[in-house]
Amino acid sequence: MNVPKISAFSLLIGSVGLVFTSTSTLAQNDGNCRDVPNHSQLKTALGAAQNQTNGGFGLEMWGTIVNRDGVVCAVAFTGSDRGSQWPGSRVISAQKANTANAFSLPDLVLSTANLFSAVQPGGSLYGLQHSNPVETEVAYKGPSSHFGQPNDPMVGSKIGGVNVFGGGLALYKTINTLRTLVGALGVSGDSSCADHYIAWKTRFVLNLDSIPGGVGPSSTDNIAFDISPDAHNHPVSTGGWGHPNCNPAFYNSNPSLLVSHPVGPNP
């Protein structure tokens, strides 16, 4: 009776095949984007928000959506082509989305704007901004002509990164009557305060702002302009989660986002 010989090489190839199959399956599971906006929905909502007065420079914007696993699901821009916005803001928008998703919970929401003061030297989260680095191979992969399109090279991959100024917001929707954290939105391209305003209005248009309690004003994830100099002229946030006021003349004289674009199910 002849027993076929199985070489070590054959066993190795089989094992590698199993590993790749398993990894591929996990990637597909992580990449499920059914509960977050697609490219068309993001682009429409982002454009509507950018077209409003937001206290910045009126610049064109980048926007990125990630799912709860941190996988990029959509990247879009508001200008006529990919060069109409700051090119560097594409990756920053993805970094903001990753941050808002990574540090929000089903029962606690944090925006990137909320993190600014906490990560300063002496702050309770100092050093957070150096964790979870950006995956550069994903960030800069081409072709560049696909940037901001439905087939943007970041889509389907985890970007990583931590950003600690305005423009990143977690996304919550109702699934089977339960409030569910489904991912996050990141916006970049203007002042950090305008980025937050545009992200907030984009999330409002998408009707994904049924948020739980947060550390910002009125227990939300809104931006808090509560930084002022202490006795030694050092900037200090009264509540510990403050963000610099980029344009006091605008932000101090206009209605709060909580008034103009309240959180919760839209009427």
Model-found features: residue ranges?
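Bacterial N-terminal signal peptides that target proteins for export
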Residues: 1-11
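Short beta-strand/loop turn elements enriched in aromatics
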Residues: 3, 15, 149-150
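Bacterial N-terminal signal peptides
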Residues: 10-21
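Signal peptide processing junction and immediate N-terminal pro/mature segment
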Residues: 21-27
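Flexible, solvent-exposed loop/hinge segments and secondary-structure transition points
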Residues: 28-267
